[in-house]
């Protein structure tokens, strides 16, 4: 499961703490974004992508992608991998299109869609 959560477009109604109960979580964003999310998800691993092509290849090979607005989510959307978009209620301009793609603005929906894609 690939995660890329930027500082810029976060939904402050959402937390990722429930992911501590899951394995195989890989963060591919910036080091400081990883360190911030690792406070909530201690089992989160980090990979520093060499370039955007490698990032796209990693996203393409994932079980599913979780992210907010940014390059990572744009790649996941373009590649049509199963994906979860952390929607920003202050700036709702991106919407998932296609099968196995969901957006969430509230914690209950995040956990529900996560379980659906992880089954």
Spans of model-derived segments:
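Donor-binding and catalytic core of enzymes assembling or modifying cell-surface/extracellular glycoconjugates
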Residues: 10-93, 98-101
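Conserved donor-binding/catalytic core segment of Leloir-type glycosyltransferases
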Residues: 1-10
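Leloir-type glycosyltransferase catalytic cores
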Residues: 95-119
């Amino acid at each position: 499961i690939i995660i890329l959560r930027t500082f810029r477009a976060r939904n402050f109604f959402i937390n990722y703490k429930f992911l501590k109960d899951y394995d195989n979580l890989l963060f591919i964003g910036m080091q400081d974004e990883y360190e911030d999310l690792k406070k909530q998800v201690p089992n989160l691993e980090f990979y520093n992508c060499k370039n955007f092509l490698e990032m796209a290849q990693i996203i393409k090979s994932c079980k599913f992608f979780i992210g907010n607005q940014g390059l990572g989510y744009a790649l996941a959307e373009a590649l049509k991998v199963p994906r979860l978009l952390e929607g920003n209620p202050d700036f709702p301009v991106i919407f998932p299109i296609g099968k196995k793609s969901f957006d969430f603005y509230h914690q209950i929906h995040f956990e529900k869609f996560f379980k659906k894609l992880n089954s």
